[in-house]
């Protein structure tokens, strides 16, 4: 007991700030020499000093100053708070066995070996020694823990009850209490400044054992001391836990997470749509989440499309066609192009019921637009939106547009289109035979050639140049084979445009030159006047052209009324020249005739321009006697012309011998000829 007190008296001397590292080294030697002499009989003194210490609280010394948490201890390891406090309850609870390690820890306050009893000097050398000694004490604690201490005692930290205070001059009576202060509750030390121990230069360790050399300078952050092997295993365990994926959630949790994800996505997109702004991608989401969102968005788009189409089908059922589908609902919807849009694409949160689906040429509905859509019924899902195929002809598209908008324009364009597309008509057998008789007059080798055409032109008194004859034959060659056969001849004689051009030319015969385009109509008109064709052929040809003229006149009136109504509705300015170009030939003929009647009618009643001109294909039934006399005179002139200019074969073709073939003595011929006016030259 006295020997121990003599060892503790130098503490009062070491409390002064002038103590240097030499005293610390000497005290360390004393500690190492006195360690084996400590016995278990000192427990009584320890208990007594502990009770006195509880009655008289002493200002905290160097250990408390060392245990103060510093900035370096916060950045460093946190191993020390879980180790040194574990040594304190061991000294208070385990009894004599724990006191065996007491002398190792209880050292004079001037020494720098004991971790709880050493002060923190103001000099830099003492600071370095303090760090080194703290590491040494931890090594000693590690050796003690290996002697049989349990992990339960090692894992109990002690609460911190006081803060570090500056050192005070201790009395000799207080110098003998370091072993008692180790057993009272001490503040939990921080991580300490031993972190910087390997980097700083420390004084040489006197009498360091091999066990202390093997101890690690830095302890792990788990309760209780660990070796390098333990730290390696802990690092491997942490790496394994970090690499292992989390356990898969339960099905109920997955459903709940999916619902929450869908609701969050809808709310986020609704907020973006309301704000009208679109930012970049919020955060990277998983691949499966993106797939689920795309699937939900596609479902919502299909339902919204079906609903809008069903509402449109109820309003206008004539524009859609009912299609029965036995497959799933998605089969009755036109397949949309599968394009992966940005997940942050802004779209309206809900589609109003009055919004019509876009036309085939417009922009499709974006797929990333989930919204509140009402469920559709099975009846609405059976309706399919009609697909309009694009038309290649602009004229057909214009015609279809006018058909939907203007009925008058529709009838007008339909009439004009049918009039243009009408190339040839289906003739009856009698009409075809009548035109065959006219074709045989040219007496060509199965076709109309230049020689036969010149002979007929000489017969009727027309003067054409060879170039004009060739031009007439080329215009009559419809199929372009270089020959004007009966088929080409029939197509020319039934052409409506050529016919009305010929009628107009006959009206304006003194003002217009000869037209090779209508030469065959001019020849036919003169032959009818001269009665050069058989009676049945004349009747069939006359009836055919009268019907054509009547149909053309009615169509001209319809065209005029339609154009007038359209002009009044759209207020189209009247342009006489443009109207003249757009008029059909029938209307132009009627307009010219009406204008001729109005000009100088009272002054010149006998003028041919004041009356309806004599058209062979339109016979008049009045003044029979005058016309009979003119017909007989015309017949004698034609007989003289044929007998002098044509051969006997051609003359016999027109006038056959005998009473039945003679036109002069036929009563029926005279009756028909009485209705035909004569054309004067």
Swiss-Prot record:
Coiled-coil region(s): none
Ranges annotated as biased composition (Low complexity): 319-335
Bias kind Basic and acidic residues: ranges: 1-14, 251-261, 662-671
Domain EF-hand stretches: 464-499
Stretches with biased composition (Polar residues): 83-94, 159-173, 264-281
Annotated region described as Disordered, given as residue ranges: 1-284, 298-336, 653-681
GO function term, MF aspect, one: calcium ion binding
InterPro entries (UniProt xref): EF-hand-dom_pair (IPR011992), EF_Hand_1_Ca_BS (IPR018247), EF_hand_dom (IPR002048), SPT21 (IPR043520)
This protein's name: Spermatogenesis-associated protein 21
Species assigned in the record: Mus musculus (Mouse)
Native organism taxonomy: Eukaryota, Metazoa, Chordata, Craniata, Vertebrata
